[in-house]
Amino acid sequence: MKIIKIIITKRGAGKYSSLFPFVLILLILVSVFFAGCIGTSDEQTESNATITVIDDLGREVVIPADVKTVALTGAGSARYMVYLQAQDMITGVDITDSMTDPNTETRPYMLAYPEIANLSLLAPIRATINAENALNISPDVILFSTEGAEGGVIADEATAKTGIPVVCFEEYEPSDDFDNFSYNIRLLGQVVGKEERAEEVITFFGDMRDDLIARTPELSMDEKPVVYIGGVSNRGTHGMLSTKPEFVGFTLLSANQKVADVPATNLGTASANIAKEKLLEWDPDIIFVDLGTLNAEGGGALVELKTDPSYQSMTAVINGDIYTVLPDTSAKSNHGTSFANAYFVGTILYPEQFSDIDPIAKADEIYTFLVGEPVFAKLNANTGSLAYQKIDLNTI
């Protein structure tokens, strides 16, 4: 606030000296009035202040300097607001984050903050923006988890219709695309005024990534057991032949997964379906099963391993080396679960190097930092109470 100083000099008594007190009071009132007006003007200027950010699509977006509310669209975009401890700023979500079931939910951020599902609906279709809904919600900024360059077109059209700035970001895995992941966390932190927390999140994932790599023994692939993960979810639940070429528990631990030998052009990275003949040819020594498969048609991967005659000849089935991990793909990747799974896998593949790790305690340490609650027990209950276990197929 600007302060007006008024200096009054008394020059002695005269015929107007009796008016001095009244003049003084008048001048004080005038100064207070103008000071108030100037203060209001300054406050209005501050409230109208803007900054320009460069979003993940390279778009220059002008946003308020002090964002108070955000609406979200795109799969799992609320995840990052929870990571940044900015969940109270969310005023609208798209269809993906507008639904949750406490008895089946596997998204840690939704278990910690189920009330997100009760927020206003920004878009009835994932990764879109309904202009009318946006105007009704009236957020300061819309954050858009895009799925390609076409997201920029959607964002520009929405801003043209509503006047609300839209900041786009892609999802990157901190395990294998750490720089882009870090850029986007910083971007989101800048938008919502959580720059310090953004750096904490980046450091947290970077430290886990480095720790997992450092624990991995220097062995040739021939010295390592052949591993496979089946039952991986991706836009639905699947059976044994659905796998994940970039499963964090294998990539960071340099595991001997034969799926890595398949040309990348033949596989997706989030998930891929392989031929049964290939799996039998690889004959894994150890099989991990994503528990998202429990909801697949026919009972999923565990039932298939038990009942399909062709699987009975696999080394992992014969020796009973079948283990379970939590589903980490629901509304895209839940990075905390990906890393929690990796620590569990480490205790199985390299027990000596991971002898100090209690997988359940480690998982809750991760969840507490990222979503504010130790939600492993809830996740385990929602996946048949089978997480992080060696499975006896006779009990399935």
Tell where the protein language model's regions lie, with residue ranges:
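Secretory targeting signatures
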Residues: 1-48
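Extracytoplasmic substrate-binding proteins
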Residues: 60, 154-236, 317-387, 391-394
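Short helices/loops that flank or line small-molecule/ion binding pockets
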Residues: 65, 128-141, 273-283
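Structural recognition of the beta-strand scaffold that forms the well-ordered cores
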Residues: 71-73, 91-94, 141-145, 166-170, ...
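Solvent-exposed loop/turn segments at secondary-structure junctions
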Residues: 76-79, 96-99, 141-142, 147-151, ...
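A short, structured surface patch at a secondary-structure boundary
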Residues: 78-137, 141, 146-147, 258-260, ...
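His/Asp/Glu-enriched short active-site or ligand-binding loop at hydrolase and phosphoryl-transfer sites
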Residues: 246-268, 319-326
